[in-house]
Amino acid sequence: MGAQFQRHGTGVFRTKLNKADHPIMKGFGGFESWDETYVHHLHNENNRTVLELRAEGKEMEPWTWVRTQGKGRVFYTAWGHDNRTWGNPGFQNLLERGIRWAAKDDTSTVPAYLADLPFPIPEMTPIAKNLKPFEFIDAGGKIPNYTPGEKWGVQGEAFTKMQKPLEPDEALKHVSVPKDFEVKLFAAEPDIGGKPIAMTWDERGRLWIAETYDYPNELQPVGAGRDRIRILEDTDGDWKADKSTVFAEKLSIPSTMTFHKGGVIVQNGTQTLYLKDTDGDDVADEKKVIFDGWVLGDTHGGVSNFQYGHDNWIWAMQGYNNSSPTINGKRTQSFANGFFRFKPDGSEIEFIRSTNNNTWGIGLSEEGIVFGSTANRNPSVYMPIPNRYYERVNGWKTNLRLGSIADTHLFDPVTKNIRQMDHHGGYTAAAGHALYTARQYPKEYWNRTAFVNGPTGHLVGAFVLKPNSSDFSSTSPFNLFASDDEWSAPIMTEIGPDGNAWVIDWYNYIVQHNPTPAGFKTGKGNAYETPVRDKKRGRIYRVVYKNKSGKPFSLENASPELLVSTLANPTMLWRKK
């Protein structure tokens, strides 16, 4: 048969489809049903092809498969406990396909079943097989090796070899994207002067990046940092950066930024700053401290993801550092691990809702619905009701933590060369949750697909959002971006002025911040110290659909008429300018 039943639970679920080119799977989009959640053991993988898998904890459980036995054929599926599945048209369609295949009949006579498909899963472009082989160098035992298993943080013998980094043009060849999409390079080192950690765009469509050298263990005193904000501009309309201007320097770990009234609000280590250029030379000459006193004992547990909200507040995320920032010397409420918002002038700040983990991800839909992501198996979060509504009820405790809405935390990399400390095979460091709020991509993406970065898996997952009455669920049936280059580490994806997704590739062989592996020391930023951690490489990519980039657009010195007409622009970034 191919395996033996071991145990089961129950639930409503849908499977992950596999082998789309198999005769049984052509034209089959899957379905959702209540059923028993079978787990098998004693697997016989000889001559077996798995067609469906179901998420089971940290693993993907084979669910439907075919195999050959002598001259015979076997079709097996774990679906089918009772009438809830047997009465499902999707199951009936799958069963007919399986029976016809096992009987060596023509499966193409079975009608396509796509009615229950949440998203037409795209075919992925293959990575070419004739590329130059990766080169490896001696790392001297400086690469930690955590072994997969039920026990957390188990280390094996350290790796002694590591892959050499690739040049930007060569790295592009190692990326897989959906069919009809293409990855294009906008900027890379040496035009970027450090590790790109955040990005946004101004009213002229120019890319602004925060670049860091001080992260993770070298947070500097105020005014003594080595980090910058840089403007990267395309002056000739080819969608490649050809002009670079340093807007601000002497910063330290500038983790996020957004625009307000001709200036930029920047989270600079322990301070939230407002920086502005007043004389037109694209160099900041005015500075105001909006908030001070943010805790940054752990540099990957701070503030991130400034998003200008529909309510004219700045929305953001606070990591697991417990902070109570000050406004004009007065201490505000203390909070950690969750969504917060503040008025751009710093007059008010409000903690919105707790997540269940350290967090670096927020995304706003076109309606202003709020989503996010966290570390440790929680790549997709929905924020339904702010704490302030619960606080109006006397005696109501508001320690309500938001869990995952995703059907699984597991991801789907294109390489086995993945190094993770925990939650092996899944999102342990999910970052961002940017909804596709433009119209260059196919219609099924519009305002219902979010892009979540998985740097340890070298990928950006696409999460399809589904409203369920007053709640949401999400599933990630494919990747927007996936690389087999061990240095590739996407940390931020946002929708750019051209209506395409732009990706920051941190491009670092070492992604892990903490805990500190055996044999290593903990640095001042609570990240383990290693000379292998890169300080100079970083790339900005655009994921373009059918070469649709649009024409460069600008609202600089825009007339009232242009501003009003821009409210109908298909890209939300421009509507919010």
Regions found by a protein language model. Name each.
Residues 28, 102-106, 464, 544-547:
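Sec/Tat-exported extracytoplasmic proteins
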Residues 21-29, 92-104, 365, 434-439:
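Non-catalytic, well-ordered alpha-helical segments in soluble enzyme domains
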Residues 2-72, 78:
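Catalytic beta-strand/loop cores that center a nucleophilic Ser/Cys/Thr
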Residues 121-568, 574-577:
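Beta-propeller domains with acidic blade repeats across secreted/periplasmic ectodomains
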Residues 1, 81, 301:
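Histidine-centered active-site/metal-ligand motif
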Residues 58-60, 68-147:
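Extracellular ligand-binding/catalytic regions of CAZymes and related secreted enzymes
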Residues 19, 23-26, 93, 428, ...:
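Generic recognition of short, well-ordered alpha-helical interface segments
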